[in-house]
């Protein structure tokens, strides 16, 4: 769920007429962050001086955290991503009569492995990309204690984030030094202001995703 906040109000540069036509044809959620910049954009966008946005909060209207929102306007896919894609997993579990609970990243961060210890299996969402040391510790401890960790997503466990000690709803991301990234942190800005820790990729922090789930994101084509 940290991914929902980090991508919150992502204004994509390719929001074109074809996208709007698809929204109308599918009767999808009609509003898009590109049209409502006064609510604040995502950490995949830029400030007016072209510096990358490194802070995000879910305590504001988030256009792309709504059922039926289409993330991608072109191509032959569903156009769904993150929350909307995850909702299909919930619907499938309900249709199959499989009981489940939802555990948020915040619960993992605050309660650690205790929040998931009593479960036999844990399945991630479709895009578990952003993590704190505490959430990774919880998942690793769950796995090492015999839990079945099912990773069916993509680009998981990639970026390190920090939460504000004064307001845990605030998330910070520093896109430093390497990796596929929307913008690059400037020299001297690789460390989080919230906790002083080195940011960037988990791989550069000694915890590549392969250590946790055996596979990890390396590169991408046109996106």
Go through the PLM ranges and name each one:
Residues 78-165:
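Helical hinge/lid and interdomain linker segments adjacent to catalytic or ligand-binding clefts
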Residues 18, 36, 47, 122-123, ...:
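Alpha-helical protein-protein interaction elements
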Residues 129-223:
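A glycine-rich, often tryptophan-bearing local segment used as a flexible ligand/cofactor-contacting loop or short
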Residues 1-115:
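Aromatic-Pro/Gly-enriched surface loop or interdomain linker
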């Amino acid at each position: 769920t940290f991914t929902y906040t980090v991508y919150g109000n992502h204004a994509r540069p390719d929001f074109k007429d074809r996208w709007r036509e698809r929204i109308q044809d599918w009767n999808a959620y009609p509003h898009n962050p590109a049209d409502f910049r006064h609510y604040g954009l995502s950490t995949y966008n830029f400030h007016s001086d072209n510096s990358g946005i490194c802070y995000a909060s879910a305590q504001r209207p988030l256009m792309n955290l709504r059922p039926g929102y289409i993330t991608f306007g072109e191509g032959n896919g569903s156009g769904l991503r993150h929350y909307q894609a995850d909702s299909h997993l919930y619907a499938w579990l309900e249709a199959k009569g499989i009981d489940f609970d939802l555990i948020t990243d915040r619960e993992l961060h605050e309660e650690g492995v205790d929040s998931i210890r009593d479960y036999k299996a844990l399945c991630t969402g479709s895009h578990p990309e952003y993590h704190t040391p505490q959430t990774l510790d919880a998942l690793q401890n769950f796995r090492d204690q015999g839990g079945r960790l099912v990773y069916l997503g993509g680009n998981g466990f990639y970026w390190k984030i920090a939460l504000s000690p004064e307001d845990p709803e605030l998330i910070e991301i520093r896109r430093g030094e390497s990796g596929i990234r929307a913008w690059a942190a400037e020299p001297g800005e690789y460390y989080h202001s919230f906790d002083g820790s080195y940011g960037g990729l988990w791989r550069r922090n000694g915890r590549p995703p392969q250590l946790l789930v055996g596979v990890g994101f390396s590169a991408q084509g046109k996106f």
